[in-house]
């Protein structure tokens, strides 16, 4: 075997690990099923010159100096602040919900009272989760939380995950907190930016290093075999270290059953207008079918001579063999699914030359910065192994 490592998947996790290993002198082959690198962050320029993200909106944001210093080696960071809205009962309100939301749905006297109670009961905190507010001892706080839960969280969860809120892992409901101020940005991290030339360009620079070769349009699973007697994974019948970033259940032929993932379908529309909506992303929890609309001329701001590009986003059940919905985007985190994943994880640990990393392989709902940090930390633990 001419390679020291086979890396399955050319997304962030695979690309970063390939780069770090190549810098240490290893020979790497990246095998990617799709016809492009960059995973779900892949972007392209449409016919009107608009940079569009094929698999939905991504923004780099992190509080980690390590992540920022690493990733900005491969891109020119353009400062950006994500702004989102949600449409509730026909009213566009900031998302995450903030004090403006209270002003929009309460009269001035009750709004002032509720804002004061929130500040008194969560002192010094910039935000609070709807889960915490639903458990509050203050009736007015509970009522407001219930209003938001019924009008947004519950409906959005049902569409996004095809589950009721009580079925999903609480961490999912906590991803979008309620802001205890008039702050109207989606993230409040130390760093938030977009790569000036796009995510595909950034990923290309990551893997552009001596010792890295890339195969696109190749399903690595057609070349991988599992030998339980030797506790070894083979690639084209040869033993080689394999870093796998795909779906762990698929790797092992669904030996312990299928893990649930959600997929997405996008309806992209080029529109002859300067602006379609107020902000980059608008959520529609009460609308049937789609969950949100992304306007890409606002991610980041792009002036494209009277044209814009919007994407209606429809969550659907993942099915590898379907015409649409055949890309796994999100692991569906429930108590049952996580127990099943742990069975796969324990089984995978038997194979000495197999390393797992990434949202699908780790069965975790990672943000981009978490994937970057996970790959860097994993590499550090591999130093003796490499």
Regions from the PLM with identified roles:
Residues 3-30, 379:
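N-terminal Rossmann-like FAD-binding beta1-loop-alpha1 element of flavoenzymes
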Residues 19, 23, 43, 208, ...:
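Short, well-ordered alpha-helices that flank and scaffold nucleotide-derived cofactor binding pockets
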Residues 22-47:
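Glycine-rich FAD pyrophosphate-binding loop
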Residues 24, 221-347:
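Mid-domain catalytic core of redox enzymes
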Residues 38-40, 88-89, 94-96, 161, ...:
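Short catalytic/ligand-binding loop motif for oxyanion handling, primarily in non-cytosolic enzymes
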Residues 48-122:
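Dinucleotide-binding Rossmann-like beta1-alpha1 core, especially the glycine-rich loop
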Residues 89-94, 100-238:
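Active-site/ligand-binding neighborhood in enzyme catalytic cores
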Residues 326-386:
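C-terminal catalytic lobe of FAD-dependent flavoproteins
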């Amino acid at each position: 075997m001419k390679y020291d490592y086979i890396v399955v998947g050319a997304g962030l996790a695979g690309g970063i690990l390939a780069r770090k290993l190549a810098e240490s002198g290893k020979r790497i082959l990246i095998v990617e099923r799709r016809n492009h690198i960059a995973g779900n962050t892949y972007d392209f320029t449409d016919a009107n010159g608009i940079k569009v993200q094929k698999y939905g909106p991504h923004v780099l944001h992190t509080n980690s100096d390590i992540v920022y210093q690493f990733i900005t080696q491969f891109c020119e960071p353009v400062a950006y602040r994500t702004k989102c809205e949600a449409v509730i009962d026909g009213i566009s309100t900031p998302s995450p919900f903030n004090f403006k939301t209270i002003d929009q749905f309460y009269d001035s006297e009750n709004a002032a009272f509720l804002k004061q109670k929130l500040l008194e009961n969560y002192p010094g905190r910039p935000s609070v989760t709807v889960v915490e507010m639903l458990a509050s001892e203050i009736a007015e706080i509970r009522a407001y939380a219930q209003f938001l839960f019924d009008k947004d969280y519950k409906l959005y969860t049902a569409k996004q995950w095809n589950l009721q809120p009580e079925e999903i892992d609480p961490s999912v409901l906590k991803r979008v907190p309620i802001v205890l101020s008039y702050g109207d940005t989606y993230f409040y991290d130390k760093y938030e930016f977009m790569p000036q030339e796009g995510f595909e360009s950034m990923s290309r620079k990551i893997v552009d290093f001596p010792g890295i070769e890339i195969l696109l349009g190749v399903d690595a699973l057609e070349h991988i075999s599992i030998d339980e007697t030797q506790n070894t994974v083979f690639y084209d019948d040869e033993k080689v270290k394999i870093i796998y970033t795909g779906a762990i259940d698929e790797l092992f032929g669904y030996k312990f059953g299928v893990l649930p993932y959600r997929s997405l379908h996008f309806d992209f529309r080029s529109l002859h207008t300067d602006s379609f909506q107020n902000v980059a992303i608008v959520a529609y929890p009460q609308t049937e079918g789609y969950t949100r609309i992304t306007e890409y001329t606002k991610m980041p701001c792009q002036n494209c001579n009277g044209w814009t590009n919007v994407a209606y986003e429809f969550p659907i059940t993942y099915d590898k063999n379907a015409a649409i919905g055949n890309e796994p985007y999100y692991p569906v985190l429930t108590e049952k699914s996580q127990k099943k994943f742990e069975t796969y994880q324990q089984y995978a640990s038997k194979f000495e030359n197999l390393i797992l990393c990434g949202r699908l392989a780790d069965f975790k709902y990672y943000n981009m910065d978490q994937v970057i940090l996970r790959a860097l930390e994993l590499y550090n633990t591999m130093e003796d192994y490499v």
